[in-house]
């Protein structure tokens, strides 16, 4: 007999095979007559199952008597109540867990109209399924058993892979703690932001195209910044960890209080200089190399003043420049 099970509502057409069936006068599912039956040949009968419950013997009666019984099981309709997780990448390949009732004997799991790549019936209340690929957006999930079908509309959401287009500012100190803005698309579902393999100290999803993140500490040099969502992990954008500038000499170390001359700073990590302060006031400067900066002196009161250099990597320790007053007679 094929199939050997069907819904409690009946209506399933089954094929009975055997011998001596040509003169069949009745087909019964337990004590209930088939809704209808057709004798195809002496070895085949098709019958429409009536409504019923449980497992019952199917018998054929002819003028020669009643046959042995073949078991037919009435299966309750499946009930699908949940999908977890509820979202994943458009490429598919991830595993989800379907929960509900009467899931034993499932013959199909579909996402929209597409069959699951594979599925396993774990118990009457649980199925695990490998999600197929699809376009971004919500989709219904359906489970089919001999007892019928159950669909959860828009139960699963396909998420596009995030794309990063920029990080601003693109550099900062080794100690981290500064905030950067990541731009791109498909960022709204972000679950992680990483600098290399280190998670951002914190991040905020501003919109589908923007995230702000607090940079963790890192080693000097370039590192990859990535964003992860249920849709996958983005391409890498570059961020540079810069060591703090170091000023070792200031030549000449003194000059007229009226300004109008230049002095040269030597040291390391000076190439990214954004500000030079002389006595707390911004001075004009020219970056000659990573180890040299030429600074325009500012007029001011006679006496010593501090000189510092600031880059995205931090601010140097102060050096002293002395303003010398004009001689008087």
Predicted regions and their residues:
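Surface-exposed, short loops/turns at beta-strand junctions within beta-sandwich domains
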Residues: 49-55, 131-137, 215-221, 297-303
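Beta-strand/beta-sandwich contexts
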Residues: 1-23, 55, 64-105, 148-189, ...
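Short, conserved beta-strand segments of beta-strand-rich sandwich/propeller modules, principally
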Residues: 55-57, 95, 138-140, 222-224, ...
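Short, solvent-exposed loop/linker segments at beta-strand-coil boundaries, enriched for Pro/Gly
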Residues: 31-36, 78, 113-118, 162, ...
């Amino acid at each position: 007999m094929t199939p050997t099970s069907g819904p409690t509502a009946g209506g399933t057409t089954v094929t009975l095979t055997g011998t001596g069936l040509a003169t069949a006068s009745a087909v019964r599912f337990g004590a209930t007559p088939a809704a209808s039956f057709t004798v195809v040949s002496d070895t085949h009968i098709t019958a429409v199952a009536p409504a019923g419950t449980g497992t019952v013997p199917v018998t054929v009666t002819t003028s020669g008597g009643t046959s042995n019984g073949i078991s037919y099981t009435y299966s309750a309709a499946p009930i699908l109540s949940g999908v977890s997780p509820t979202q994943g990448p458009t490429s598919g390949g991830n595993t989800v867990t379907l929960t509900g009732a009467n899931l034993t004997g499932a013959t199909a799991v579909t996402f929209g109209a597409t069959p699951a790549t594979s599925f396993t019936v774990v118990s009457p209340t649980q199925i695990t399924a490998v999600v197929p690929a699809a376009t971004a957006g919500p989709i219904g999930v359906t489970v089919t058993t001999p007892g019928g079908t159950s669909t959860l509309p828009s139960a699963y959401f396909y998420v596009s892979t995030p794309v990063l287009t920029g990080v601003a500012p693109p550099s900062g100190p080794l100690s981290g703690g500064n905030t950067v803005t990541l731009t791109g698309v498909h960022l709204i579902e972000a679950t992680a932001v990483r600098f290399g393999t280190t998670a951002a100290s914190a991040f905020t999803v501003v919109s589908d195209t923007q995230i702000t993140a607090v940079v963790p500490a890192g080693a000097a040099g370039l590192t990859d910044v990535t964003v992860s969502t249920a849709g996958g992990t983005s391409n890498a954008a570059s961020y540079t960890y810069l060591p703090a500038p170091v000023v070792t000499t200031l030549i000449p170390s003194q000059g007229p209080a009226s300004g109008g001359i230049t002095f040269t700073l030597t040291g390391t990590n000076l190439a990214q200089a954004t500000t030079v302060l002389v006595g707390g006031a911004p001075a004009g400067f020219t970056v000659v190399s990573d180890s040299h900066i030429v600074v325009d002196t500012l007029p001011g009161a006679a006496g010593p003043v501090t000189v510092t250099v600031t880059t995205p990597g931090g601010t140097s320790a102060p050096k002293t420049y002395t303003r010398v007053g004009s001689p008087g007679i």
